[in-house]
Structure formats: structure tokens, C-alpha cells
């Protein structure tokens, strides 16, 4: 792949891993008190420190470092919602619920762990993670390729010929749908699991506009996830057509401001014929109010809120972000967090385990899990490994020849179900390899 700079939205990745590794009881609980009643089942250390998000974060990070081998690496964080955007609009992200306490506790701890390992991090109370990544990309993309890893599609506006967005999806199936749509093969690309790589051409094909106009699109259509209103009355389809035609909110209003009745009629007719806008949004775009955020005022404010900054001063040279992990310090952190199943395996001369050389297919559906286990019971030789802390199982990996599967503890796939599967497989196969026999027996005995 060659040298490149990898920028990771740490807040996005940690949150994704937290929710992806929650007990099913919390995922399906409707009321907050019902969720809190099951907090004791969240993965934690023997001292009661929540670690499920960090566990997934580090596993994912180590896998990327081993397989994608970024020459340079930085993790960016949101520290607060009270950034400069709240100064522009007090209700920015005002529709979001409070961060769950078990997740909130893990942000500072994850940042501390990464710092102790020697991984470069970016954080500033006045800016968001995307602003820091945007400024890093702008500074260094002329020197080498940049990859940005996140689940947030706001980052699409940063995509250029030398900056690729690795957009994460919640399931492998959703990712595969996009690969199939564009007749692309993931196997031909060196990218992480559940990620689709967006370049400028793919952004335009998927969203109908160039990357540099994504913020302007949100200026008209808004963004519910960030409580950005856009222009009330202007829908997403109309917004795409208008931005594709005019490029920016400013240029759109240059075309429609100060029109007389004849001019308004003419532009409505033009939009109808050229842009196929059967219901003209002109009245909504020109609406004015002293009490409501509408029309031009809403459009310009929304565009500004949606614009990722790319001009934050980055004083460190590229070499400062050279990928390096202090392996002794990292192992100390893994021991502190009681992550006995997470391995540091970055050096090519080291012999990786079977699970680190296989692309594991994630199995999250209970019915599918039974089907896969039935097929695996026909194999004579298997490799099996549990993932988790000292006392909690968060998943199980099974390898058979060149195929591998990962069963996370999620939805109706429980710890007891996985140990039951392990029992069945151990009884059916002739030979079973387990990387950590002591830990394997501990899990099996504890969940009888």
C-alpha cells in the first residue's frame, strides 16, 4: 500500500465498539432504568471498571496496525459538545441523549491507555474530532496519502484525490451491499473490516454531489443527527439537485435574491425543466421570520455548522505521527485492563495465531449461528478461541481450514450459548487447537 497517514475518529470508534459489545438485555431495554438494571453484565475489570468499548477499540486498532500497516497514525477525540459550534447555535447537537455512564467513563481511560502506549492523539475543547482530522488531512495530504476511519458521514466533505474516507458500517452485510452496488471486491483492497473506501468519484456516485459540496447540501437539507435544521421545507432530493446546479449556498442565493415576480416565475420554470423540481422550494428558501430559523438565515448557519474546519494550526511535523507502540507499556495496559485474549502481534517475524491470519466472518444472527455450528461439526480439525476478560466472554472465534467465524456476544447469542457450541464442537471433531488452554477451561467451567 505504501506509506500513508491514518487518522482515526476515536470518539466514533469507541462508541461503535461500546454499543457493539453490549449485552442484549441493554440493547432491547426501552426505559433507562431497565438498561441500568443490566449494567452489571457489561464487560468490566475485577475492580468494576467498564471496559467493553476499550476492548473492542484496541482489538480493532491492533488489527489495523498489523494488517494495514499505516506508517503514520493519530487518533482524534471529541472532548465536549460545547465547541465553537455551540457558540454559533446553542441547540447544536441538542437533540442527542446523554452519553451512557459506562461509555462516558471509558473515554478518558481509553485516551490514557493510548497515551501510555505511545500512540499520538489529537484533542481540543474548542473543536471536534472531525475538525482536527480535517486540519491534519489538509496539512499532510500533499506529502502522502491520507486515510480517515470513522462512522460519521460528515467526513465525506474531506475526500480528495489524496484523502480517502474509510467509512465504517455496523454490519458486514451493509458494507457488502455497497461493494456489490459498484461491482467492487473487498478482497482486492487492503482495508479494515466493515469499511467502504470513498474516493471523490464514489462520493459523487453515491450521494449525487462532489465531496466539497457536502456541507452545502447540509446547509439546505440539514442533518438531524447534529440537530442542524437546514432550510425547513426543503427536502433532501431538492437539496441535492440545487447544490449540484449551484455548488454552494452562497451561489444559490446569488441566483434567487432580489428577484421580481417575473424573475421568480422564470427561475421556478427553469428548476422545473432543468432540475426536474416539480414542486418549487423557492418560497421556503426566501421565507423570512424574526422568531424562527428559516430561509436564507437557516441555510447559511446550517452550512457553517456542517463545515469541517481544515485550518487549525498543526505545529508537529509528519514524523511526529510515525506509528509506534511501546510494546512493554502496551502489555502492561492490557494486563491492567485484564484483556487476556488481546495479543500484541505486529512484527512480521512473529508467528501469528490462526485467527490472526484469517478473515473472520462475523455471525450475529442466532439462526445463522446454529447453521454455521452444524456445518463446523462436520470438520475433523478445528481451532477455537474465546475473546474476553478474565471472567467475561465477549465472543468466540472458530477456524476450519481456510474459513473462520467470529460469534460476538450480542442479541440472542449469549456466553452460555457460545460455551455450549464449544462443547458440541469439541465432541464432534477429532482435533481441536486452543491458543490458551487454561483460559479456555476457565470459561468452559465457569459457564456450565
Where in the sequence are the language-model features?
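Non-catalytic, usually N-terminal nucleic-acid engagement modules in DNA/RNA processing proteins
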Residues: 1-74, 84-85
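Short active-site loop/helix that positions an aromatic residue
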Residues: 14-20, 156-161, 396, 437-448
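A charged helix-plus-loop insertion that forms the helical arch/lid used to bind
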Residues: 29, 80-107
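Extended two-metal-dependent nuclease catalytic cores across DNA- and RNA-processing enzymes
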Residues: 40-44, 94-314
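Short, basic/hydrophobic alpha-helical segments
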Residues: 57-69, 135-139, 415-429
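Structured, non-catalytic alpha/beta "coupling" segments that mediate domain-domain communication
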Residues: 65-76, 80, 145-157, 161, ...
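Active-site-proximal helix-loop-helix substrate-binding element of RNase H-like nuclease domains
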Residues: 120, 174-218, 358-359, 397-448
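Long, highly charged low-complexity segments
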Residues: 319-426, 430-431
Amino acid at each position: 500500500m505504501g506509506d500513508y497517514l491514518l487518522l482515526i475518529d476515536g470518539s466514533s470508534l469507541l462508541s461503535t465498539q461500546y454499543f457493539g459489545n453490549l449485552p442484549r438485555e441493554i440493547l432491547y431495554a426501552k426505559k433507562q432504568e431497565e438498561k441500568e438494571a443490566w449494567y452489571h453484565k457489561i464487560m468490566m475489570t475485577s475492580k468494576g471498571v467498564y471496559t467493553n468499548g476499550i476492548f473492542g477499540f484496541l482489538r480493532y486498532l491492533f488489527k489495523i496496525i498489523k494488517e494495514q500497516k499505516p506508517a503514520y497514525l493519530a487518533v482524534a477525540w471529541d472532548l465536549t459538545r460545547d465547541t465553537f459550534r455551540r457558540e454559533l447555535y446553542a441547540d447544536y447537537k441538542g437533540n442527542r441523549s446523554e452519553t451512557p455512564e459506562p461509555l462516558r467513563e471509558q473515554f478518558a481511560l481509553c485516551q490514557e491507555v493510548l497515551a501510555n502506549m505511545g500512540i499520538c492523539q489529537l484533542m481540543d475543547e474548542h473543536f471536534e474530532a472531525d475538525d482536527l482530522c480535517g486540519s491534519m488531512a489538509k496539512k499532510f495530504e500533499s506529502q502522502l496519502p491520507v486515510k480517515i476511519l470513522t462512522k460519521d458521514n460528515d467526513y465525506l466533505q474531506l475526500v480528495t484525490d489524496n484523502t480517502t474516507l474509510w467509512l465504517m458500517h455496523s454490519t458486514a452485510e451493509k458494507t457488502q451491499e455497497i461493494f456489490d452496488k459498484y461491482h467492487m471486491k473487498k478482497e482486492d483492497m487492503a482495508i479494515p473490516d466493515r469499511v467502504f473506501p470513498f474516493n471523490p468519484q464514489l462520493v459523487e456516485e453515491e450521494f449525487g454531489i462532489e465531496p466539497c459540496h457536502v456541507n452545502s447540501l447540509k446547509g439546505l437539507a440539514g442533518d438531524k443527527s447534529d440537530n442542524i435544521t437546514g432550510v425547513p421545507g426543503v427536502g433532501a432530493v431538492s437539496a441535492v439537485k440545487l447544490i449540484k446546479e449551484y455548488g454552494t449556498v452562497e451561489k444559490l442565493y446569488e441566483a434567487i435574491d432580489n428577484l421580481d415576480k417575473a424573475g421568480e416565475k422564470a427561475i421556478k420554470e427553469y428548476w422545473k425543466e432543468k432540475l426536474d423540481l416539480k414542486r418549487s422550494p423557492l418560497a421556503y428558501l426566501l421565507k423570512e421570520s424574526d422568531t424562527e430559523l428559516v430561509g436564507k438565515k437557516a441555510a447559511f448557519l446550517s452550512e457553517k455548522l456542517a463545515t469541517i474546519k481544515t485550518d487549525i494550526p498543526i505545529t508537529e511535523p509528519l514524523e511526529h505521527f510515525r506509528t509506534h507502540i511501546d510494546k512493554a507499556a502496551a502489555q502492561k495496559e492490557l494486563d491492567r485492563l485484564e484483556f487476556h485474549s488481546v495479543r500484541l502481534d505486529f512484527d512480521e517475524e512473529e508467528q501469528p495465531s490462526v485467527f490472526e491470519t484469517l478473515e473472520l466472518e462475523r455471525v450475529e444472527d442466532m439462526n445463522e449461528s446454529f447453521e454455521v455450528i452444524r456445518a463446523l461439526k462436520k470438520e475433523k480439525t478445528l481451532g477455537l478461541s474465546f475473546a474476553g476478560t478474565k471472567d467475561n466472554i465477549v465472543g468466540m472465534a472458530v477456524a476450519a481450514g481456510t474459513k473462520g467465524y467470529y460469534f460476538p456476544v450480542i442479541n440472542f447469542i449469549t456466553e452460555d450459548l457460545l460455551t455450549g457450541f464449544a462443547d458440541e464442537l469439541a465432541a464432534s471433531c477429532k482435533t481441536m487447537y486452543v491458543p490458551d488452554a487454561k483460559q479456555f477451561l476457565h470459561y468452559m467451567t465457569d459457564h456450565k
